[in-house]
């Protein structure tokens, strides 16, 4: 990888340095950055670093990150799940449908909302039933995004 300073900063002992490095790397378009972001998303002990890695991966829209993002939508911290879902929506394939549908029942409404958006982008008719159930969600934003997703599916 020719981004040696980025590698060094991504592994810095200071969490704040790693956290800011992730966001900075989102602004660079070199392919060599995506593996650095994926590694941090998968392995960093700080949820804030993992969240920022997901945010940066959304900016890259690189399908090679989909495996890592798919794992991260099961992260213990809701913000990591939310932003990983948002990034995954940019590189979606139907193989992630079941994982995304499960997130329509997440404890956090932001995660449920992102799942509805992702299902709309995915465009699979298999999402219709779960999206219809989300029309009764307690959170209005989830209901709105579920309705929009259904409209994208011509329902």
Language model features by range: what are they?
Residues 13-14, 45-46, 76-77, 107-108, ...:
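Short inter-helical turns and helix N-cap capping residues of alpha-solenoid HEAT/ARM repeat scaffolds
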Residues 14, 20-23, 45-55:
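Acidic (E/D-rich), amphipathic helical modules within compact regulatory domains
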Residues 1-11, 30-42, 62-74, 93-105, ...:
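Amphipathic alpha-helical scaffolding segments comprising HEAT/armadillo-like alpha-solenoid repeats
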Residues 24, 56, 87-90, 118-121, ...:
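Core register positions within helices of long alpha-helical scaffolds
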Residues 136, 144-147, 151:
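N-terminal alpha-helical scaffold/docking segments in eukaryotic complex subunits
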Residues 47, 55, 67, 71, ...:
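Alpha-helical adaptor scaffolds
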């Amino acid at each position: 990888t020719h981004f040696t300073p980025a590698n060094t900063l991504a592994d810095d002992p200071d969490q704040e340095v790693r956290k800011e490095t992730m966001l900075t790397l989102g602004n660079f378009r070199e392919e060599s950055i995506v593996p650095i972001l994926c590694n941090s998303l998968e392995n960093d002990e700080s949820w804030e670093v993992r969240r920022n890695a997901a945010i940066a991966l959304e900016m890259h829209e690189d399908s090679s990150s989909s495996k890592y993002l798919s794992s991260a939508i099961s992260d213990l911290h809701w913000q990591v799940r939310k932003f990983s879902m948002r990034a995954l929506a940019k590189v979606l394939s139907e193989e992630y449908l079941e994982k995304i549908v499960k997130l329509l029942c997440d404890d956090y409404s932001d995660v449920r909302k992102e799942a509805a958006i992702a299902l709309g982008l995915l465009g699979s008719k298999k999402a219709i039933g779960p999206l219809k159930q989300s029309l009764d969600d307690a959170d209005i934003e989830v209901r709105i995004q579920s309705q929009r997703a259904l409209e994208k599916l011509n329902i």
